[in-house]
Amino acid sequence: NETTAASIADSIQILYNYKDRRDTGLQYTFLEFGAMGCISCRKMERVMEDIRTTYGKRVKVRFMNVSKQETQEWTKYFGIAAIPTQIILDNNGHEIFRHTGFISAEDLGTVFK
């Protein structure tokens, strides 16, 4: 649905475009697509916390529970086919990194260097 895709694209610009918002200091958004019943997704909870702790002033971390109705449009927009999937957006809200499966905080951190 083009209307849905446009509204998600607009939401991304409103929520995650930091380029013109100097007050935030944020440079990246880390979207973690997963579900509560998924073992690898649960392992990613620790990674999300590590990223928050290490890069909190520069990286906004957001968990997107694919089993919730309110994230279905986001899941479709990003074409999520398997979980967990990590997507990193730059400060313009553009996707710069994607990974499916478990990834360590150390490996993920290389994106933020």
Predicted segments, located by residue:
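N-terminal targeting signals for export/organelle localization
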Residues: N1-D10
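Short active-site neighborhood of thiol/selenol oxidoreductases, capturing the structured segment around
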Residues: R22-M36
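The canonical Cys-X-X-Cys-His
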Residues: C38-R42, Q86
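Typically the conserved alpha-helix immediately C-terminal to a functionally engaged Cys/Sec
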Residues: C41-Y55
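Thiol-based oxidoreductase modules, predominantly thioredoxin-like and allied folds used
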Residues: F33, G56-Q72
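Extracytoplasmic
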Residues: G25-Y28, G56-V59, A81-I83
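Non-catalytic, surface beta->alpha helical segment in thiol-disulfide oxidoreductase systems
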Residues: A82, I87-K113
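A short glycine-leucine-enriched loop at secondary-structure breakpoints
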Residues: K76-I80
